[in-house]
Design a protein with these regions (language model features):
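Sec/Tat signal peptide C-region and signal peptidase I cleavage site
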Residues: 20-25
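Immediate post-signal-peptide N-terminus of mature secreted/exported proteins
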Residues: 26-38
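Bacterial N-terminal signal peptides
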Residues: 8-19
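Positively charged n-region of N-terminal signal peptides that target proteins for export
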Residues: 1-6
Length: 136
């Protein structure tokens, strides 16, 4: 009889805990998504805007895929004007500037991607910060 009570207690615990953890994860995703959407809405009003040698030309969030994407174009450089190691160096900088954010440095599933293009609009680099990149 004692073992049956123990099994029932374990089943109740598992039955309650698993859905509850899914609810917490779901609520966290909803909070992050809402915050990202609000930020995108505000920043979109400013686009295009200058950011040093670049112009920010796009920002979006995909809550289903959990990705915040920004896009910028260099004001002067064409694709061939960028150094060969630009992708590698820019990835290091992107990681450094975004991995202090708990949304990306913990296992939330969220990532931030930036597309860097030359002045003609050709892709030069695609950089990402997420839990796996921030854990390297």
């Amino acid at each position: 009889m004692q073992s049956i009570k123990t099994l029932i207690l374990i089943n109740i615990f598992i039955g309650l805990f698993l859905p509850l953890s899914q609810v917490f994860a779901s609520n966290l995703d909803e909070v992050i998504c809402s915050a990202m959407n609000g930020m995108v809405e505000q920043e979109s009003k400013k686009i295009p805007f200058s950011a040093g040698e670049f112009s920010v030309v796009g920002i979006s969030v995909d809550c289903e895929k959990k990705i915040l994407t920004t896009e910028k174009k260099h004001i002067d450089y064409k694709k061939e004007d960028f150094k060969l190691n630009f992708q590698e160096n820019y990835q290091k900088n992107w990681k450094k500037s975004n991995c202090s954010n708990m949304i990306f440095n913990t296992n939330t599933g969220w990532s931030t991607v930036q597309l860097v293009k030359g002045k003609e609009g050709f892709l030069v680099a695609k950089v990402r910060a997420d839990f796996s990149k921030c854990s390297e």
